[in-house]
Amino acid sequence: KWPNQWEVTDPVTGVGIGRSTMVAFTTNETVLSRAEAYVHLKEYDKAVADLNAWIGSFYLVGQNGIESLTRERIAEVYGDPSSDRYIAEYTALEPTSRKPLHPHGFTVEAGEQEHLIQTTLFCRRIETIADGLRWGDIKRYGIVIDRFDDSAYNDDNTTGFTVAATLGEKDLRRALQLPQEVITAGLEANPR
């Protein structure tokens, strides 16, 4: 994700230092943030256009079975249980990419708005993997996180996963703890 760049420090001996550059704001992540904003403004066509721009940065749409998104296709995936493409809501027994949303301080309407938010969150999850940005989505939408114990996993039938811990929608651990120096100086720590 972050390419390694070699900087030669001594050309005679060929010694150098490997460096990686992490870009704070990528175009792709910014486009997905704008798509999310368009969904909240109910400008769904603009949101889908941004989602398609993001997809186009990875894939040649129209080739090898890659299709562009439409509002109808998104509704089929998230709203039509009879469709082969339908994604059911996440449960611990049947994990999927479609998480129940419990937004804090705003609402997400059932139907098209929720479908587009789910699509955008899934794209953001792919785009921001290993960047540490998923936490903002988890907190903002109150997404419940299950941690699985796979010690009894059976590769033959993919069974044996059990939920070891859950971070609930109103779990106090969602608030980051204040630094110890601040607590020592007299500020009350965030409750746990």
Model-identified regions with their sequence ranges:
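Acidic/polar-rich alpha-helix caps and helix-coil junctions
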Residues: K1-R192
